[in-house]
Amino acid sequence: MHALRNFAGNGIANVFGCGIRRRLSYVLGIETSCDDTGIAIVDTTGRVIANVLESQQEFHTRYGGIIPPRAQDLHRARIESAYQRCMEAAQLKPDQLTAIAVTTRPGLPLSLLVGVRFARHLARRLQKPLLPVHHMEAHALQARMEHPEQIGYPFLCLLASGGHCQLVVANGPGRLTLLGQTLDDAPGEAFDKIGRRLRLHILPEYRLWNGGRAIEHAAQLASDPLAYEFPLPLAQQRNCNFSFAGIKNNSFRAIRARERAERTPPDGVISNYGDFCAGLLRSVSRHLMHRTQRAIEYCLLPHRQLFGDTPPTLVMSGGVANNDAIYANIEHLAAQYGCRSFRPSKRYCSDNGVMIAWHGVEQLLQDKEASTRYDYDSIDIQGSAGFAESHEEAVAAAAIKCKWIQPLV
């Protein structure tokens, strides 16, 4: 049942055994949790057979944020053609699919409904098992598809995206333990709101970019990257929770003060926006590093030993893992503890169908009998969803005092 638990160094193919190495299985993944329509096919060796992604970013950027009913309409308009294109690219017949995996939780309910209804229809028509997928679990496990020899269970994962910020220990699909989570905003959400308030979208090069990408690029233009410094959130709380509302509000105040000093017009951007973005990135990096550092130390406690017998491993995933400056700092932090660090390829950090298909593969690997479900109508959506276990209280009770590792820049 737990063939993958001690799998580091063995490779995916070895876990399956000779019989399955001769006959590949294909899992179709469907992702519609927010504003991306993703459909992909992954085989049981982790090879991506086809990957189709329809982004709604350009539409929602024009309106300053995601509009759930319009996101649902766009998913409905695109999902059938995305599926057809995926099957054509894979050069497979529908009956060659082994199973269909679909995001059921968490996410925007209106968006989730489109994917789940389409998946039910497809599974029923093809008489294939339907595998429900936890969206954040899929982010956490994605790097294993690309690094099967290096990432074994258990491992620590920092999940940072537009809707979430969590620290979890992964032991397998459906077997994640929460160590800490954001108490308010997620980092990607904060980047988007700060980017809009800074009015980076006025600049032609950032017109169609999300806030995080624009801020990362603008930070590279800084002449004085230490010009802005923001208070560290939750500095007195010895747990692994996050808070980005303070950084966001302090950013708004700093922008407003600079605009007043420069008399920036309503359609203008402060002159030292590069310095501001560099300071913002450093502050977010410090906060992520501090909470992750405590999580590493908690995992290494003699009476916990949450890494088990595997080499200590830290994975960062989610849309914010695309940010090279932030990931470099997380990588730097991990190295101080002799901890290996990984992230998915950039094309797989943000939402996509590949990670959903791969989670389906992981479910089948862990327990094929339990994962093979034909009770289609009982598989439904959940707008919010937690994990199997939580150590949040235990982390706080441990009250670990850390000697902080400083960011690279």
UniProtKB/Swiss-Prot annotation:
Keywords (A to Z) from UniProt: Acyltransferase, Metal-binding, Mitochondrion, Transferase, Transit peptide, tRNA processing
A molecular function annotated in GO for this UniProt entry is:
N(6)-L-threonylcarbamoyladenine synthase activity
Q: What is its EC number?
A: 2.3.1.234
The protein's location, in the record's own words, is: Mitochondrion
User: Any note on cofactor binding?
Assistant: Binds 1 divalent metal cation per subunit.
Cofactor(s) annotated in UniProt:
a divalent metal cation
| Entry keyword Mitochondrion | yes
Q: Which GO terms describe its biological process?
A: mitochondrial tRNA threonylcarbamoyladenosine modification
Q: Which Gene3D superfamilies match?
A: 3.30.420.40
Give the domain of life.
Eukaryota
> Got a GO cellular component term for this one?
mitochondrial matrix
Query: Which Pfam families would you find in this protein's record?
Result: TsaD
Q: Record-annotated residues binding a divalent metal cation?
A: 135, 139, 351
Q: Where is the transit peptide?
A: 1-31
> What is said about its interaction partners and assembly?
Homodimer.
Family in the record: Belongs to the KAE1 / TsaD family.
Protein name as it appears in the record: Probable tRNA N6-adenosine threonylcarbamoyltransferase, mitochondrial
User: Which organism does this record belong to?
Assistant: Drosophila melanogaster (Fruit fly)
